[in-house]
């Protein structure tokens, strides 16, 4: 919320590696915490070319998801191809209620629910994530 406000650009300039570390760690599940090296790598990616000073500009998606809700919902409800979801049920960002909303739009949508994963399943459990991608591609007839 702070990033969306008039002090957003100031807040992004004041963000420290310590603050980032705390926030980033909080979106991983307790069972699969991010490593110190993972935090350091992601901080390095964020600060490259002063990317850490753009946070207030990147949160525009929060407003856009309201403005373009019909378009985004239509992309789910009208999709003609194979569509599947994998969801980390401990994700504090994309809460289970978000998944429930997607399932209201597309009730027959196959979902893999990972009770022990958070916001970044691909980092928390790469083999399981890769297996889900392989399974999804095989089910859709896509070449592996």
Predicted segment positions?
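A conserved nucleotide-sugar
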Residues: 144
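Catalytic histidine-centered segment of alpha/beta-hydrolase-like enzymes
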Residues: 114-130
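Flexible "cap/lid" subdomain of the alpha/beta-hydrolase fold that forms the substrate-access gate
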Residues: 1-106, 110-113, 134, 139-141
């Amino acid at each position: 919320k702070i990033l969306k406000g008039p002090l957003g650009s100031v807040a992004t300039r004041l963000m420290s590696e310590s603050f980032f570390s705390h926030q980033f760690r909080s979106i991983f599940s307790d069972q699969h915490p991010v490593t110190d090296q993972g935090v350091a790598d992601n901080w390095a990616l964020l600060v490259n070319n002063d990317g850490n000073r753009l946070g207030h500009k990147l949160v525009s998606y929060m407003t856009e998801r309201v403005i373009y809700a019909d378009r985004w919902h239509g992309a789910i409800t009208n999709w003609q191809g194979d569509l599947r979801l994998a969801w980390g049920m401990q994700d504090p960002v994309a809460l289970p209620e978000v998944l429930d909303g997607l399932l209201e739009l597309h009730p027959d949508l196959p979902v893999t629910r990972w009770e022990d994963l958070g916001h970044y399943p691909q980092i928390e459990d790469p083999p399981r994530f890769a297996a889900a991608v392989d399974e999804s591609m095989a089910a859709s007839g896509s070449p592996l």
